[in-house]
């Protein structure tokens, strides 16, 4: 019916006087094309979408088998002009029975665009792969567009680095390259690729075990450095591997749980089949609060679903030797325990078992992955001058940019590898955010016009040459032309991503040296853990968290702040008034961070991104968006240990339901609330500008209301 209607519109268009005038000058009509017209429903005629779509000046792209069927028994007739009045009548009555043609066609258009985009990306990726095989391996190239001032600083820093034999000292594990406070104990990541390549059978066996188990999902339970690299791998490679594309067998879908928010835990559980899921508990120390809570929760759930005898066979641990988790896993009969390397800190552990065991479980060819990383390892070794060393050069740029005020490292990445930004964010922010200094990583902030950015930005563009984003290319080119410093990292294809893991680890270590910091410690992370333990201890004694009084409450939304911030903000009679006063404190060179302790789903992220951009555009400053408690193991160190240039908006929510945890005296809701309030108290102790907004359990409605209040608050900014 729709086709007949469309064809009638088409014919009317080419019968107009306007078209006849064009035709008289040689214009030719564009033909209507009917695509994907094979019949998929066996209840229909195999020539249905050919028989019914015949008309003058049309094209029909049919599969070969459909064409053969039409030759054999198709019906040849000008069918598109038959029963046109009936088509109009049916279409006019659709709304009466609750069918919106606009909604249907809008949905089909959106779905079709995704399918064509995926097909095009797949074609380009195949071409890139063939090109890679023909050309052979190469190190991902980079280019620097820094502007005169920063370029001069980097050139001078490179000369000093080379004169001091900086690269050799790094590989020699010379702690004096940093602060001489034990840094040499945390450099095991320098040799991890070589060590991992020496045990290929380990990863083959991991993959074989998963296949043998017939698992549909692998659920990794972890936080921070133990979960972020697997999350990148899952988001980058998981869809193709779990779908079994390119004729390959299907692999389990790798999922990550790194939030104590009850709604997030519940949503994750709802997405899996407990009987077909392998659970991976990842924790270097083996004593981290969140993974242990996740582990006990799912041990209980699996035991109830399958029986206690089956539980151990469904769990794997990744942890350092001698940890509490190793002991627990041994006592409870876990299927396997994989050891980390004690000389590698969590955020530098991507290429150790913490990244590579989950990689093998989801079907990644770990041997090829590590071989790709090895190209960057060799390029970063001593021998070349600093600016010819891809990791050292990037690190010098990051460090010098931060020292001259360009401390907002703004990541831009082709959509296919966008998830690597969260891993870089943790690596760089947690390594450099201390002693009043920090490289503040801005990840996931959509690009704007060059004039919307201040002089505190450094842009790094991770571009996939195989499937680039044209809009990003134009925006980054405009930034360069406007004089903003830009570093370009040109990845051939998805297979080049392993190189970036090692490049950024080297770069972070070098940046720490330039900034005079120890990049391997995290002195301020423990403060939030202590505050959280104080909150949960209070709950164990009183069955409630310490009471607190809101500064303002209206329509289910309450505002909280510590005494110093409350005094600085004054008194207001509306949510927009409090927000206006809070963001009036933003100054040039500051950044705003939204810290949201809500379920990390697409709808919440969309709404929070809208609020984030509203703040950025109104105040012309850098913005960060983090979901709690995930960010506590990432940017939380920089927020507390870095300069007092952050303005924080914390968002917490009522929990529609809580989830009890076996062997714990409290559920996930209490943990999440204690983490939020504990971290806020530490930020307050550090004199940070902060405001907390607490909303009801209808988070979508609350975030929409918050955004409306923000719009009002920032209208005259």
Give the location of each predicted region.
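Catalytic alpha/beta core domains of metabolic enzymes, predominantly
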Residues: 1-65
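A C-terminal functional module that forms or caps the active site or interfaces directly
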Residues: 44-96
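C-terminal extensions of enzymes
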Residues: 80-136
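Extended, charge-enriched "interface" segments that sit outside catalytic cores
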Residues: 136-214, 466, 474, 488, ...
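C-terminal amphipathic alpha-helical interaction region
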Residues: 137-140, 521, 526, 543-547, ...
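Glycine-rich phosphate-binding loops that contact phosphosugars or nucleotide phosphates
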Residues: 208-384, 458, 462-467, 473-481, ...
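Active-site phosphate/pyrophosphate-binding segments
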Residues: 304-460, 465-470, 503-617, 621
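Extended C-terminal subregions enriched in glycine
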Residues: 468, 591-623, 627-630, 640, ...
